[in-house]
Amino acid sequence: MLEYWDKNFYTMDEFYQDVANGTLPAYAFVEPRSLYNNNDYHPPAPLAPNVPIGGWSDVRAGDLLAHDIYTAVKASATITGSNALNTLLLVTFDEHGNCFDHVAPPTATTPQNPQPEGELNFFFDRLGVRVPTILISAYTEAGSVINRPIHHGAVVRTLCTKYNLAPLTDRDHFAPDLSDAITLDEPRFPSTWPTPIPRIVPPPPPGLERRPLNDLEKTIVGLAIARFSPQPGATAIPPTLGEAQTLLRTLVGDRFKHA
């Protein structure tokens, strides 16, 4: 994705402007904050037992992000371009949150054939534990539930079908698409959609800037150093969140500014 960094990556402020102005691209992907004042739902997991937890996270911040995006899409009413009636909003997760699931993960098409062996003798021939997914569309009946097995490859399959793209792997090539989520011939107007009220998100705790980075945060900072530091070999990963935030702003802050 590096070749598209200066063309296809934008800030959340610009995203909301595009929603309001009806200028969203055909496909937009929102990545939550995963470093400092997180809103990605991901807990700041300890590095090992009895090791202090670095960072800070509050699931209410993730709920607020989902609320703000949904509310912006619901309010978009431009005559041309993107608007609430022609935008499909999909909210999904890459992990199940370590919650128990009584349904055993089913088998799945391997990405390749033959499929090379992965870690722990795994051949990628089975799906993982179920994750929640919310689909919002003016052409989806309120309260609809899809009970058949669908995995993340369905998103890629849907995009490939809609835009006549080649599949990435056998997994997404044989995946079901999301077409059965579109159940209405006439749209439900946004005035009939729910109006959720988000819970108040408290500010980050005092001293957050002095907390250590967890493994995910170290990876994010390390990638930024490797790509954008003029001397990557001489630039160390900072030990605290505050120092990491300052470094990231120095390395990549201006790269989101578009002419």
Question: Model features per residue range: what roles?
Answer:
Residues M1-A259:
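N-terminal pro-sequences and low-complexity stem/linker regions of secreted or lumenal proteins
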